[in-house]
Amino acid sequence: MDVHTRWKARSALRPGAPLLPPLLLLLLWAPPPSRAAQPADLLKVLDFHNLPDGITKTTGFCATRRSSKGPDVAYRVTKDAQLSAPTKQLYPASAFPEDFSILTTVKAKKGSQAFLVSIYNEQGIQQIGLELGRSPVFLYEDHTGKPGPEDYPLFRGINLSDGKWHRIALSVHKKNVTLILDCKKKTTKFLDRSDHPMIDINGIIVFGTRILDEEVFEGDIQQLLFVSDHRAAYDYCEHYSPDCDTAVPDTPQSQDPNPDEYYTEGDGEGETYYYEYPYYEDPEDLGKEPTPSKKPVEAAKETTEVPEELTPTPTEAAPMPETSEGAGKEEDVGIGDYDYVPSEDYYTPSPYDDLTYGEGEENPDQPTDPGAGAEIPTSTADTSNSSNPAPPPGEGADDLEGEFTEETIRNLDENYYDPYYDPTSSPSEIGPGMPANQDTIYEGIGGPRGEKGQKGEPAIIEPGMLIEGPPGPEGPAGLPGPPGTMGPTGQVGDPGERGPPGRPGLPGADGLPGPPGTMLMLPFRFGGGGDAGSKGPMVSAQESQAQAILQQARLALRGPAGPMGLTGRPGPVGPPGSGGLKGEPGDVGPQGPRGVQGPPGPAGKPGRRGRAGSDGARGMPGQTGPKGDRGFDGLAGLPGEKGHRGDPGPSGPPGPPGDDGERGDDGEVGPRGLPGEPGPRGLLGPKGPPGPPGPPGVTGMDGQPGPKGNVGPQGEPGPPGQQGNPGAQGLPGPQGAIGPPGEKGPLGKPGLPGMPGADGPPGHPGKEGPPGEKGGQGPPGPQGPIGYPGPRGVKGADGIRGLKGTKGEKGEDGFPGFKGDMGIKGDRGEIGPPGPRGEDGPEGPKGRGGPNGDPGPLGPPGEKGKLGVPGLPGYPGRQGPKGSIGFPGFPGANGEKGGRGTPGKPGPRGQRGPTGPRGERGPRGITGKPGPKGNSGGDGPAGPPGERGPNGPQGPTGFPGPKGPPGPPGKDGLPGHPGQRGETGFQGKTGPPGPPGVVGPQGPTGETGPMGERGHPGPPGPPGEQGLPGLAGKEGTKGDPGPAGLPGKDGPPGLRGFPGDRGLPGPVGALGLKGNEGPPGPPGPAGSPGERGPAGAAGPIGIPGRPGPQGPPGPAGEKGAPGEKGPQGPAGRDGLQGPVGLPGPAGPVGPPGEDGDKGEIGEPGQKGSKGDKGEQGPPGPTGPQGPIGQPGPSGADGEPGPRGQQGLFGQKGDEGPRGFPGPPGPVGLQGLPGPPGEKGETGDVGQMGPPGPPGPRGPSGAPGADGPQGPPGGIGNPGAVGEKGEPGEAGEPGLPGEGGPPGPKGERGEKGESGPSGAAGPPGPKGPPGDDGPKGSPGPVGFPGDPGPPGEPGPAGQDGPPGDKGDDGEPGQTGSPGPTGEPGPSGPPGKRGPPGPAGPEGRQGEKGAKGEAGLEGPPGKTGPIGPQGAPGKPGPDGLRGIPGPVGEQGLPGSPGPDGPPGPMGPPGLPGLKGDSGPKGEKGHPGLIGLIGPPGEQGEKGDRGLPGPQGSSGPKGEQGITGPSGPIGPPGPPGLPGPPGPKGAKGSSGPTGPKGEAGHPGPPGPPGPPGEVIQPLPIQASRTRRNIDASQLLDDGNGENYVDYADGMEEIFGSLNSLKLEIEQMKRPLGTQQNPARTCKDLQLCHPDFPDGEYWVDPNQGCSRDSFKVYCNFTAGGSTCVFPDKKSEGARITSWPKENPGSWFSEFKRGKLLSYVDAEGNPVGVVQMTFLRLLSASAHQNVTYHCYQSVAWQDAATGSYDKALRFLGSNDEEMSYDNNPYIRALVDGCATKKGYQKTVLEIDTPKVEQVPIVDIMFNDFGEASQKFGFEVGPACFMG
């Protein structure tokens, strides 16, 4: 035992007192009680010294400490720390003590309020907690639930989070808890716990927080101890955390294993990890020099060097003075003069001596007098904290002198000494351990007791400074002195007995609602595991331990789960979990690198005989296999080619002589081929020509076995004999050994197809072979399943312009366009029912074009228009997005073979397809070369082996003999050629694994597997070279309107087209003069409507036409006065074709329209006089294409208008089907050369398409080099006046431009002659009704007018009669591909092939049961072949025979019965990915678990999310030039040049013949400069076209090179940025700058986006009011907002001051629930309104945590009277009785048993009800009832 204290003997006992040796023996031997109070160091349990995540080392309480080299070590704890451990690690072998101390040295972050430590029971209820901060709380709840939360001890007026170090000691004793702060401030509180409280140690301890608390302890900590003794708290500053001028006791302060931190000398430095205190000393060690235990004690020798100091000095029994705050000096009073003097190096007194801590049973009311000499030292007596009473009156020192007996000591503390005192101890036993001068203690004669002297002044004794004088003579006994002055006040004693309970205090005010809990993550670390590629961690001790800890933690933390919480802070990486259940098959991964050759798998059971397979490629020679046992002799094979002469083998036993065979032809000497797998037994072949005499043949079956001869001596090898005839067929011998492979022979003829072999395991992927030559185009395969859409491809070259297609059905709503500048946003009106047709009003004055209004509601679809004349080719638009896949075109002619492409990467292995039909019989293969002869086995004992003769040729095949008895199983033979796939056989026994074969050459391409799962999009490939023109695409969607062009001059009136669909009513023109009635012209067929011309002057008012049939009901009411001119509305969609009314009155003569589509030449109409030029009206929307009109009367020529500005590019539409060829168009302007495209890969040459219609002859350009297309040139000079061109080909209707500014009103023209009716222009916007004009004279009957647009919604009219059924609509667009279906069932077998020649054998029967082995009969002579017998019952499988020739293909057998299930096969290929299940609700945060051990390496993770799009790849190599295609149609006209002066009118010339396609002309003059929209310099520099002059020269004419102007870069940059902006408008990214409207919208644009947080802007417009939401794409694209922190719920409590049936907002701690976005910002009302408008349904979860409280159904009564009620956002109350959209996902509270939870889901189409804003609780208020709740996010589904 270490000696850690020094004794100075200044005895107050009288010399000769006899009881001291027994007393000392008792005191020195008594094991102190604190052995049972070993401190439990929580910092060690939590592994602080290994610095887990969030823990770092820092300087502790003392920056310098006496006798230490460096400062104290503490640990800094940050928010990232997540530390927990099972409580049993603190108390592994005992229960948690009833009375205990918590000791800690800590510096909390200033202003923080968090729990330092929390202990939970197995159910997850907190039992003990210490909260640091202002007014710290000691949380304690025993097994009975006492005290309640309102009775937790609260230490007011104390601030533990002031940023300073504090030494905190908490003593829990009986029903009191005492907090001792910094060794001086002591506060005791009542702890209302049960008499025998129990703390469950089956839970966990959590450091630094509470489960679900958001507050986390932050600061520095040096010590955290639990001591199973309540008295330890009073000694904290002496024994555990002394002041800085005191050496550290033999205890590490925070379990730091660094030996240099505290102790720097001795053998055992740094070894103490648990506190070990020397509570008693061994008597044998007394007086000896101390032995160092954990560190040396240099001053220990002083203990034996004080012999002269032992003279008793009674006056020195006064205590040493107290030093402030226990500053490292012990104020110990010894009994007599045994004073405790602390060593300089060690400071390890016994912390809890029973004499020091007497409970005061003898005299509890006496004041404490430390100097009264009433204390008896045990190893050291510490009175600085003692609470001992003084002896009772009359029992002072005299009593001690005479009665210092064993009984006296016992009486001082009966509870303590009895168990330890040994009555057998004798004084003699103490001798060896006492100091040398111990006899002086007993010398002298006791005189009478003197008076007690005055109390002396306290001595100031510093350690090591005490100088002792010589002992003085003993004075006479004095009279009893007067009472001494009151000694210094002792430190506060232990708490006394529990007093009577005080009156209950007033209930405290409810605290503020706690913040929502964070999601605690189990901080497991995942360590390394098995080798890469292993399936998962092997089950290990670590894993089972982790499972046990997890299970324990789950039990410890099982509590009511909350609703979906916010994502918690990521925890540290934890250890791996236990192996999970096997997951769903993952997606097929990409082709991995070639793996290491795996071990051979076990052989499967033999399968049924399969069908014959096609010939496999000749394999490489196999390795030599082990020698097999001898098999039975097989049947003789067909004669083989002559082999090389073999080496002489060991002599075998002589066989019976064979018959001489005829000599056969010599075969070619070939190398040995690989033996094949056994094929099916073939037919008997024709007898071959006689072979040359062979060597002795194998034993035949014909002869009877001869008598066994004696073993002869071994003969010398004889010369090779003549080749004999093949011997008779012998019994099958044992299988011979496989010989070494021979040299490779010439390739044989293809053999007959063998039966298909069993499916082998998939081989390792071979290296990629060189790319093969591209094969010719095969016949089209069957339609495969629709694949997933591929990644967006590079834009293809412009295809041949097709003819105008028929009008498609209404497309899906496009993305919202730019928000228009003009127009007030009108409310969207519903489409009213059509009113009755009103009378035609007079034409009013033309109104000015108003600004475009917002788009109106969609009108009903119009009838399908007739096919119109093809329009003129439009200008090339900007590159649009790739159109959807068109319908497949007609196959063209076969193209030439393309160049060799680069090999593609192997695709993922497809699923196994169904078994195909059985193939026809293949050609007969050549007979394989016989293998080497095996060693002869002897049926009898082997004779001397003879020399091996040369191999003879194989004889002809004999007839099959009778089936022999089954022989012993042979060893595995070499693998044969692969046969065709056989039917699945019965499971064979597992054979030994064969050696791996070499990789064979690449086999033929297999059948196309089913479509694999959609892969992640690869990086975009390099653009391919321009392929052949593709088929015409569908018509593109309508582009955005271009900027308003300048008003054009009037064109000549077009031919009258057919009436178009009814357009919007045009503006009412001003009243015109009445014109003369013109003679009615011959009615021409209606032409297609031309573009709207300028409005003409008002014509005369015609007479009213005959009443038309009843039109759709119009707005009722009288005609109003003229209203103010409204803004021009946008073009509506085409309306339904209304019935054609009777001709109305003739309208005013319209202005000449622009050139209409050219109709076929009709009869000339009467020429009208030229009309006055009218005002230019705004162009109306283009009507649907009308049918090709018959030639109408020709109109008068109008003035050509000025050219308008070019509109914005529209998106490229899907190309429509090819139209009819139009007449040749005019020669277009030479287009500007475009920029050179990137070189694309050579496409496969497509089939030759049909030649396009002949285009008009283009101008012959100067033969230039095929240079890269240049940028648009600058504006050129106006050209000379050209002659009038020929009528051009009708182009597709152009995009409607925005309304141009109204032109100046023209002068009223003279009255013109009555002209022919002009073509109906597109309807203009509805103008205000004009005043009634004077009634005109009847005009000619006009053509039926265009149908007007739907009028403004009027009051509902009477229901009209039902209309006729409309024409069937056109087929819709191709839907998006559906998911890949499961593999279909096996198809039926193909058609049966032509019958083959009848085979001699029937088809193989089913495998029969194994027959009994028959007795072996003597082999008979081979008989003649008999007639074919009926198939016998199947015998047992014989041994493998020599492969026979392949037989004819038999008919397919009927399927056999299902075999027994085989053993588990290897894992199948991954199945198709299942449909995504609906995303579950976000789970409630789990409780914190324990840190487990690191696990094995986990399985390879799933494929990650697609990476960002890669940059464009390098330009590909030039492909092989394809064959020239047919001459394409003319390209589109170039960009328009500046308008030239008006040319003279030319006459129409005849159509010329189609010219050859000319070479590209020189670049046209530059076009007008466009507006520069903030060019992006990066893009500008990126889009700079650098043209290498050498390229141009290489290509030919260099003079075509045009130097770009500097401004072109800006134009290209602007175009590029515009393109990006438009792309982002169409496909928002969900960022703050580019938000989507809803998550559903985002999912539609980006189906691959993962769940997460994205920005949305439901009201669109400026994105500054966008907000971040959680997008749950897994659940279909729902948009989720979250309750704010204070609305997330409330902790479970009893709510004593609240009334049932009240709303939560009425609670004292309640409020209305409010919601925020994912960044915590409130969501605006307008945005929520729009979000609801964009949503079809919404859902939200509420979790109710209960303790004996009902949330929904009351299971006892079956009623819902106490169900929660919710207040929706629309102030609607919702509960079980009035809302069917609420359902309970979990209703654990219905039973009212213990802690449970109920999860309610509100999933409603009434989106205005969600989110909920208040909750009414109805079942609480009783003493045992508690509840809490959590509110989940509100998610809206579009």
Curated annotation (Swiss-Prot):
Prolines at the third position of the tripeptide repeating unit (G-X-Y) are hydroxylated in some or all of the chains. Sulfated on 40% of tyrosines. Residues 377-388 have a biased composition (Polar residues). One of its GO terms (biological process) is negative regulation of endodermal cell differentiation. Residues 559-1570 are annotated as: Triple-helical region. Keywords: Calcium, Collagen, Disease variant, Disulfide bond, Ehlers-Danlos syndrome, Extracellular matrix, Heparin-binding, Hydroxylation, Metal-binding, Repeat, Secreted, Signal, Sulfation. Changing residue 25 to P: In EDSCL1; not or less efficiently secreted into the extracellular matrix. Disulfide bonds join 1639-1671, 1680-1835, 1746-1789. Belongs to the fibrillar collagen family. This is Collagen alpha-1(V) chain. The gene is COL5A1.
